[in-house]
A protein has these predicted regions:
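Flexible hinge/capping segments at coil-to-helix
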Residues: 97-99, 108-127, 210
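Periplasmic-binding protein-like
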Residues: 24, 101-108, 173, 177-220, ...
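Short loop->beta-strand "edge-of-pocket" segments that line small-molecule binding or catalytic clefts
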Residues: 17-22, 40, 118-133, 147-148
């Protein structure tokens, strides 16, 4: 097990507490118990393991969307974030290799004439996305003809869609499948339009961010190889995702 030196640790967690941003907008990563408000999920397990390895207390700070967690890590409010790898965010955030891969999918109403993912990017189609999400950033780059309509978060995409916004909903496959149980008359287009690589991100503004990122990359490699990530996914009943390749 690789150890972390004091200058790197001081740069990584300058307050003496590891402040971790938890994205509740993606149920693959984390969830909140509606009664106790306790946070649980794969990212919570990884955060606590990192805290144990560096001998610091962990403060879990929940956010409703990936975009909000990214903003917080860029301003230095938090020390670490679990977020999708994206080149736009990469200007300010240093990533580890991915620990989980998630599929992005499209959902339409059963009456829709759309049958395949390739048909979505056409003039007249309107795709509802979660503002600032990994798939929003991806589709912003890739979609040429359809329009993108941004919901406040990934969790509200289907609510907006069912209230009459757009004719296609985009999101993490598991989130869409969960939402479809709340609303009748929806169907998923087969396959996926992207693979979302989830990683740990830290702010590049910190003095020793490169050595911190190297340390965390080693931790992630160990957690994948040892079965820690796979066990966490099984424990939290995560479907529609897989442990990222080594």
């Amino acid at each position: 097990m690789k150890t972390i030196d004091q200058p790197t640790l001081s740069s990584f967690a300058p307050t003496g507490v590891l402040r971790v941003g938890i994205n509740l907008g993606n149920p693959v990563l984390a969830n909140e118990d509606p009664i106790s408000k306790n946070l649980y999920g794969v990212t919570i397990d990884i955060a606590n393991e990192i805290g144990k390895r560096i001998s610091l207390p962990v403060q879990l700070i929940p956010f409703k969307s990936a975009g909000a967690t990214v903003d917080a890590v860029k301003t230095g409010e938090i020390d670490l974030v679990f977020v999708a790898i994206d080149p736009v965010r990469g200007a300010d955030i240093s990533y580890t290799p991915a620990y989980i891969q998630i599929e992005g999918a499209y959902m339409v109403k059963v009456s829709s004439p759309l049958k395949t993912n390739d048909e979505v990017d056409a003039a007249g189609n309107e795709i509802v996305v979660g503002k600032g999400s990994a798939y929003d950033l991806y589709l912003t780059r890739e979609i040429k003809n359809a329009a993108l309509l941004r919901a406040a978060s990934s969790q509200t995409v289907i609510d907006d869609f069912m209230s009459g916004t757009g004719n296609v909903a985009a999101g993490v496959k598991q989130q869409l499948e969960s939402d479809a149980k709340r609303y009748p008359g929806l169907r998923m287009l087969p396959g996926r339009f992207m693979v979302i690589n989830q990683a740990i991100g830290i702010p590049k503004a910190r003095a020793n961010y490169e050595s911190t990122s190297a340390y965390l990359s080693n931790v992630i490699a160990e957690l994948k190889q040892s079965g820690f990530v796979a066990d966490a996914m099984k424990r939290h009943n995560i479907q529609g995702a897989k442990v990222a390749d080594q």
